[in-house]
Structure formats: C-alpha cells, structure tokens
C-alpha cells in the first residue's frame, strides 16, 4: 500500500518512546542541510536516537543569506554572533520608479556555512550521531545503501527517514516521490558602490530578464552580494555579468546553486515499503517562492516534523503549509507582471500600505496580506490583473 500526501496526514508516525533504547526507534536524516541539522538537534534533545548521513564532510560552501527576525520565533537562542549585518530597509526599483521600504525590525544577514557549523555542534551535543563522507545511493528492499568515496558500502534499516538532501533529493528519487521544481541562483561578492546605503538592500524588478528579481544585499559597510534567481534554461551568468557591468561593479567571487520552489502537491509525508519519509527544507520545497528564501521556512519544516514525531501534532506544519501556499498564490500573480505592472504597483503604493509592508515579516505573509489589503484595498486590482492575464 503506497501513500503520498500533499495535504497533511492526520496520522503522523507516533513516537515509540522517548528513550534511546531499541534500534527500531532510530531516525535517519539524510542530508546535513540547515533543515536537517535543526531537526536532528531538536529530536536528539528530546531523547530520540538520530543518525545524520552527509556526503560532504565540509557541509557545502559559503553563501550569504538574508533572513527575517521571524527566525527567533523558531530558534530563540540564535547566536547574536551569527548575525553578520543588519538591514533596516529595502530600495525597490522598477524602471525609473523607486519605493523605499523601511523595516520595523531589521533583517539579518547571515552566512550559511556558519549556521550549519553551529547547528552541527548543537546536534552532536544533544546526542545526534553525524556520519560525514557517506552518500545515499539507493535502496535494496527495506535497506538504505550508503557509499563512501573509497567504495565502501553499508546498508541500514530505518523506519523513519527525513529527506534533507536538497532540491535534487536522491532520497525522493529512490522512493519514487516527486522532487520540487528548481530555480537557478547566482550571486557575486562585490564592493559596495558609493550610491549604496549599507543599511538597505536593493531589489530591481526586471521581468524581461527574470520573473523574480535582482538583489544587492550589503553584508558589511564595505561589501555585499549582487545576484538573481531565474528559471533553468535562462543564461544566468550572462544576465548577472551584464547587470554588474550596467552598475559598474566588479565581481570578487561567485556563489551559486539551485534552490527548490514550493508546489502545493508536494508530499509532506509518504509511506513506502515500510518506511515513512518526511521531505524537509529544499527537498520538501519549503521555500517562499515570492522571495526565493528558504532558510527560515526550512527550519520551520524541520521543527514541524520533529513536533509530529514527538507526538505534538501537525499544527506547526499546517501553519507552514498555509504560509507557503500564500506565497505560491502571490508568485502566480507576480510571474505575470510586466515592467509596467511593477512600475504602476510601486508608484501606487500609499503610505499606509508601505508602512504595513515594513511591519509584516516575509515569513508571515499568510496573515499579513489581509492587513496589506485593508491598508490599501485598491491593491486588489493589481492582483486581479495578474490572475486574469
């Protein structure tokens, strides 16, 4: 009997006790992503036996990220030293139209590798076993197969599996589960130009290049990253180089990769051949498709599955599903926008709507969109124009 669910199951896997006794109780997490390590930490801290398999001992390379302070709601003790820089507002540009968006609470600029390293320490300290250098290569009956670079293989049996191995998840492929759609992401480290405010990020809407946007995120008073996200098949390096040249900026280094996107029919829980698989983070498409941000929502997804496995219900997962669904609907509208649509939108934003946008964290859009429409009901016409096009 196969089961795969996009909607949340009302019958999560019940915990079989909170002690570490019994091999049948252990939880296998495949992938040392931020979402995977966060889930490992929370589950191990609650007394569950957790083993994390990660093929890359270095836990992947650096990437500068921007997150909202909503992260503190999920991780109250997030270390202050992990915040490299604070962003107090955004400059939004479309053509020649500019809108300054002050934030009530500053966003944080963080470094992915540093956050992973810290979570690795927390997970190990809580009792999770971290096995690096092992790649998941498939399954044989009820056994999971892992291989080292030297060709050594081991086979493990685990009833509960958290797939935390990214947008191109091998786990989901091995179990015949759908993987999320992906976007390309590329950004260049640059010296901040004289016209840039170190306290404000800049967003340019250029739909003829990408249905998403370009960004400049300062990570210090002197430097930042300029990048874009776009769909596979578009010449992302050419687009970035051209935009850098247009702004008169020289790339110092590049950071790139793929990022998952959310789709409502992606499974949150699936049963296959005696296993129960929970995709989290990018593997689960737990990414805000409006902004292509997945750090906070990935952590949210890891915590939601931990709550379910510990018998605390699916409430947190349902809230995340509603949040990602709201971003999905807004993205469907924005992907139809032309440059003229963005110009009209920025030009037409009133003071109340601008203030509301700055007060609502991007990780609370599901509730905030109603506040925004209440502040400026006329925005509905922009949404309808995008939907009907």
Predicted region positions:
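Conserved N-terminal helical subregion
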Residues: 22, 74-77, 81, 85-174, ...
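Glycine-rich FAD pyrophosphate-binding loop
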Residues: 28, 32, 41-63
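Conserved Rossmann-like nucleotide-cofactor binding loop
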Residues: 35, 58, 168
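Conserved N-terminal glycine-rich FAD pyrophosphate-binding loop of Rossmann-like flavoproteins
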Residues: 56-78
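FAD/FMN-dependent oxidoreductases across multiple families
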Residues: 232-309, 314-316
């Amino acid at each position: 009997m196969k089961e795969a669910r996009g909607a949340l199951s009302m019958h999560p896997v019940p915990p079989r006790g909170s002690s570490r006794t019994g091999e049948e109780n252990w939880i296998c997490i495949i992938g040392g992503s931020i979402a995977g390590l966060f889930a490992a930490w929370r589950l191990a801290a609650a007394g569950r036996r957790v083993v994390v398999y990660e093929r890359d001992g270095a836990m992947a390379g650096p990437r500068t990220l921007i997150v909202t302070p909503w992260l503190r709601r999920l991780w109250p003790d997030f270390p202050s030293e992990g915040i490299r820089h604070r962003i107090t507002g955004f400059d939004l540009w479309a053509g020649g139209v500019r809108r300054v968006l002050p934030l009530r609470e500053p966003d944080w600029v963080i470094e992915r590798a540093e956050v992973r390293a810290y979570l690795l320490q927390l997970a190990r300290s809580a009792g999770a076993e971290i096995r690096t250098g092992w790649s998941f290569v498939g399954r044989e009956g009820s056994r999971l197969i892992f291989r080292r670079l030297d060709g050594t293989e081991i086979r493990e049996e685990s009833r509960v599996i958290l797939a935390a191995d990214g947008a191109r998840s091998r786990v989901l492929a091995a179990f015949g589960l759908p993987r999320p759609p992906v976007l390309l992401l590329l950004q260049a480290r640059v010296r901040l130009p004289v016209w840039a405010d170190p306290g404000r990020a800049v967003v340019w809407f250029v739909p003829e290049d990408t249905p998403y946007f370009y960004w400049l995120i300062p990570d210090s008073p002197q430097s930042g990253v300029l990048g874009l996200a776009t769909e596979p098949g578009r010449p992302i390096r050419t687009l970035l180089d051209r935009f850098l040249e247009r702004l008169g900026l020289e790339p110092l280094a590049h950071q790139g990769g793929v990022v998952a996107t959310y789709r409502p029919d992606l499974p949150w829980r699936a049963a296959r051949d005696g296993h129960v698989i929970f995709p989290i983070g990018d593997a689960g498409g737990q990414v805000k498709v409006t902004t292509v941000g997945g750090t906070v929502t990935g952590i949210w997804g890891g915590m939601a599955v931990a709550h379910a496995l510990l018998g605390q219900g699916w409430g947190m997962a349902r809230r995340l599903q509603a949040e990602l669904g709201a971003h999905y609907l807004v993205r469907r509208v924005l992907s139809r926008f032309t440059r003229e649509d963005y110009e009209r939108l920025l030009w037409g934003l009133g003071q109340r709507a601008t203030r509301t946008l700055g007060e609502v964290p991007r990780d609370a859009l599901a509730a905030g969109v109603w506040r925004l429409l209440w502040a400026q009901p006329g925005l509905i016409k922009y949404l309808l124009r995008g939907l009907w096009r």
